Amino acid sequence: METPKALPNAELLFVIPEGIHMAVSYKKLWKLLIDKEIKKKDLSSMAGVSPATITKMGKNGHVTTEVLLKICTALGCRIEDIMEVVPEQQHL
């Protein structure tokens, strides 16, 4: 197994064994929208992101950090409240 190397400004470094693939899941975001009674189209307007981007997130697609920050600002939450990184088979 590879030895972790220190990275500037990094609190933690994960070494992912070969063959393990990680994916992004936005299940937390969809639950938060339900809890706050916010529709996806309303989130798009609130955050200033395109409906296509929200659709992409609905398919667990990758979006920029800027998009995530806009959504968090609009919802008054943190990034870890709307997304998580999971082993690939768990995000389906």
Regions found by a protein language model. Give the residues of each.
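Short, basic-rich loop-to-helix N-cap that marks the start of a DNA-contacting helix
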Residues: N60-T73
